[in-house]
Amino acid sequence: MEFSEWYSDILEKAGIYDLRYPIKGCGVYLPYGFKIRRYSFEILRKLLDETNHDETLFPMLIPENLLAKEGEHIKGFEDEVFWVTHGGKTPLEVKLALRPTSETTMYYMMKQWIKVHTDLPMKLYQVVNTFRYETKHTRPLIRLREIMSFKEAHTAHATKEDCDAQITEALNLYGEFFDEICVPYIISKRPEWDKFPGADYTMAFDTIYPDGKTMQIGTVHNLGQNFAKTFELEFETPDGEKDFVYQTCYGISDRAIASLISVHGDEKGLVIPVDVAPIQIVLIPLLFKGKEEIVMDKIKELNNTLKSEFRVHLDDRDIRPGRKYNDWEIKGVPLRIELGPRDIENGQALIVRRDTGEKITVEYSNILEEVEKIVSMYKENLKIKADEKIKNFLTVVNFESDVNALSEKVKAALLENKGIILIPFDESVYNEEFEELIDASVLGQTAYEGKDYISVARTY
C-alpha cells in the first residue's frame, strides 16, 4: 500500500481524524486522536513553562488596518487570508481577518505592556486555531485551511545577544520535544528566498516520511528589530535611551501529530510513543467456560495495580481475542497483556510489544516492575528506530563545479534514494536557479557530522 493511501486509511481506522466536514481543509479530531494531541501538547507546554514562557490567549479577529501594518510579512500569505465582512447583515466598516498568524495581535499588545528594560524579556505563547485559504491539495493534519493546533511563541528582548540566546533555547526546546514524541529531524537554516517574511533568518526542523518526502514540522525565526520598528515596540534602556526590542517567534502545528503517526506506523496500523498514547496498556482476558470469574477477578486486580502508573484499558468486550488484538494493533497501543486460566495457574502473564511484536512471559507477582522495564525498552527502541530511519534517508553526494552535472547527480540521487540529499556547501549553487534545475526544494544550510551541506529534498 502506498504511504498516502495508508495515511488516509489509518486516520479513519484508528479513530484519529474525520475529514467529512463539509469545508475543504477542515476536519474533526476524533476522541482517540484528540488524546494523542492533548498528551503531545502537554509535553510541549511543560517544556515552555519550565523555560519561563507564559501561556496566554489572543483574539482570533484582526482588523484589516492592523494586519496591513505587517507590510513585507503579510505579502507572504495575503492571498490566503479569510475575511469577515459582515456582522449579521450589516457590512463592517473595517474588514476583520481570521488569524493567519498572530504577530499583529501580539505585537500591538506588547507595545502597551513594554515600557522599560525591566519589562524584558517577555516570552509568551499560545495554542490556537489559525486559518489559511490553502489552494493546494489539502491533506489532513498536514495542509489545512483551519490549523487546529498551532503553538506559537513570541518573545521580546533588550539586546541582540539575549535574542540570539533565545533562538538557541528555542532550538533546544523543540529538539527535546521531538525527541520525546520520537519524531526524527534535521535542522536547517532556510535560504533567504524561503525564510519567514520579515525575519533576519529562519531555522527549521524537517522530518522524513516513509515515501521519502520531507515535512517541515517546526520553525524558529529571528526577527531582529524588524517587527519592532513596524509596531513601534520601544523601551527605555538602563541609561535612559530609547531602543527597539529584539524579537523571536517559533511555531509547531498539527504536523507534529501527523509525523508521529506517519514515522512509526506499519502494515498493521499505528505504533504510538508511550508518553502520548491514549492507552498505554490494554488488558485482554482469555476466557474459557467455567473459568470466566477467576480470570475477570484477576485481570481487574491487574488493572488496579497498573493504573496507578499507566493509562490502562481493560477490553472486556464479548468478541474473539483475535479481533481485539487487531483493533488495538491498529490503534498502536504500546503494550498488550494477555491473561488466561493457565497463566493464573502458573503465576504468569504474557506481554506483547507493539513496536517489535515480541511476546514476553513475566511473573505475575513482579508484573509492575516488569512492565516498567518493558515500557522503558519500548521508548528507547522507538528513539533508536527514529534516528535510524532518518539516517537511512540521508545521502551525501560529491560536489561538482559544473552546475548541470551536479544537478543531474542530485536528481539521480533523489530518484534512487529519495529522502534528503546533502551537497557540500558552496555559495555558487545556493540559489533559486539551482533549485529550479533539480526540480526539488532547497531546505537550507545543514550541519551534518561536523560539516556544512546544502540539503535538498522533495517536500510536502
From Swiss-Prot:
PANTHER family: BIFUNCTIONAL GLUTAMATE_PROLINE--TRNA LIGASE (PTHR43382:SF2), PROLYL-TRNA SYNTHETASE (PTHR43382). Catalyzes the attachment of proline to tRNA(Pro) in a two-step reaction: proline is first activated by ATP to form Pro-AMP and then transferred to the acceptor end of tRNA(Pro). It comes from the Archaea. Pfam families: HGTP_anticodon, ProRS-C_2, tRNA-synt_2b. Keywords: Aminoacyl-tRNA synthetase, ATP-binding, Cytoplasm, Ligase, Nucleotide-binding, Protein biosynthesis. This is Proline--tRNA ligase. The gene is proS. Gene3D superfamilies: Anticodon-binding domain, Bira Bifunctional Protein, Domain 2, C-terminal domain of ProRS. Its EC number is 6.1.1.15. InterPro entries: aa-tRNA-synt_IIb (IPR002314), aa-tRNA-synth_II (IPR006195), aa-tRNA-synth_II/BPL/LPL (IPR045864), Anticodon-bd (IPR004154), Anticodon-bd_dom_sf (IPR036621), Pro-tRNA-ligase_IIa (IPR002316), Pro-tRNA-ligase_IIa_arc-type (IPR004499), Pro-tRNA_synth_II (IPR017449). One of its GO terms (cellular component) is cytoplasm. Its main location: cytoplasm. Consists of three domains: the N-terminal catalytic domain, the anticodon-binding domain and the C-terminal extension. GO terms for biological process: prolyl-tRNA aminoacylation. One of its GO terms (molecular function) is proline-tRNA ligase activity. PROSITE patterns: AA_TRNA_LIGASE_II. It is found in: Cytoplasm. Belongs to the class-II aminoacyl-tRNA synthetase family. ProS type 3 subfamily. Homodimer. It catalyses: tRNA(Pro) + L-proline + ATP = L-prolyl-tRNA(Pro) + AMP + diphosphate.
